[in-house]
Regions:
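Regulatory modules associated with amino-acid/nitrogen control
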Residues: 1-201
């Protein structure tokens, strides 16, 4: 079953340098499940560590994502490198190949479980909003945001917004989640997500 519509064929991707880091901006015309999962996967596969990220859905379903990224190998982000990232995103957005097939192209990706600083995972339904809140504090490592978004995708959860920041090797991620149009997550689902996250953090 196709998860992404034809509107995903068109999106804007741009970047600007910021010291040793880069500001990467992605604008997508329609919010659909799996966007963040695919974007974080491609950046990780291309050797980019996400230092900060802000994902937001604004009016008319337009999605604007901002990433602060840094190369894991010390290379520069060039127009050619950006074009490769864009091509891979387009292939995933159009579902020319599956996420699993794509990640299998990169068998040497360093998905490692840290041994220090036990993670803190807090997931709850506040009464003030019609979304579920997920807060995570854990040791940073390459591909972490991709792994988190992968779990949420597998639970068929829509990520409305994310704020991700890394300070002194510790990442603090805050997500707004929901199912369908305005459905908060059930207690059972929240517990399953929490346990799945603790297994990989």
């Amino acid at each position: 079953m196709k998860l992404l519509s034809r509107s995903m064929n068109t999106f804007e991707l741009s970047y600007a340098p910021r010291g040793l880091e880069y500001i990467l901006k992605l604008t997508v015309p329609e919010n659909q499940k799996g966007i963040i999962y695919r974007v974080t996967e491609v950046l990780f596969a291309h050797g980019w560590d996400i230092k900060e990220a802000i994902f937001e859905t604004i009016e008319d379903g337009l999605v604007k994502d901002v990433f602060i990224i840094q190369s894991l190998s010390g290379i520069s982000l060039t127009s050619d490198a950006l074009a490769l990232i864009r091509d891979d995103l387009l292939g995933l957005f159009r579902e020319d190949y599956s996420v699993i097939d794509y990640i299998e192209r990169f068998p040497d990706l360093p998905l490692l479980k840290p041994t220090k600083n036990p993670p803190i995972v807090h997931i709850y339904n506040p009464s003030s909003i019609d979304s579920t809140v997920l807060d995570i504090k854990t040791q940073d490592r390459p591909g972490l945001l991709f792994e988190i978004s992968q779990i949420l995708f597998l639970f068929d959860v829509d990520i409305l917004s994310v704020t991700a920041r890394t300070e002194d090797g510790i990442v603090r991620d805050s997500f707004l989640l929901r199912r369908d149009i305005s459905e908060k997550l059930t207690t059972v689902t929240m517990e399953k997500i929490k346990q799945s996250l603790l297994d990989i953090l």
